[in-house]
Amino acid sequence: LRPSLHFLGVLVALASPCLADDWGTIRGKFTIGGKAPEASALKVDKDVEVCGKEKLLSEELVVGADGGIANVVVFVRDKDVKIHPDLKGAKDPVEMDNKACRFEPHVAFVQVGQPLKLKNSDTVGHNSNVATLKNPPTNSLIAAGADSTVTFTAEEAIPAQVTCNIHPWMKAWVLVRPN
């Protein structure tokens, strides 16, 4: 136990100046152990001529051939999280598209004050119902080929679900953070 604690102390001492002076990147991969469950087919029962062209699968758990899990959200909960100066106050809109009767991407990240452009590339109308806790909820009806933009003024403690009330199988998530 002592050699382990000694090594840990040296590691922390060496890492501390780097953490204080420099920026870093943390990369990781979430994987599933064993065989992943098969994605279930979604019941497409509205606008079938458009939404039923492709077999739509649930995106609740998306696992790659290597066992990697997609759409995992990891963030720091702290009042004083520093952000790299190049990333502060992001102004370019983040896009979430209604495409092939599903939301793309399935998970989006937006900074407080950064626009979220809800787009509809389909030939049928959709709505994007964003169920936030700290921001006023939005429920935009978006005609085929149109878009709507929303800007959140407060951070959200958890990802907000995005749904289409017209096509109930459509679900996605947006995380609004200050950093």
Residues covered by each model-derived region:
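Bacterial N-terminal signal peptides that target proteins for export
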Residues: 1-9
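Sec/Tat signal peptide C-region and signal peptidase I cleavage site
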Residues: 14-20
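Extracytoplasmic copper-binding redox domains, predominantly the cupredoxin/blue-copper superfamily
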Residues: 20-179
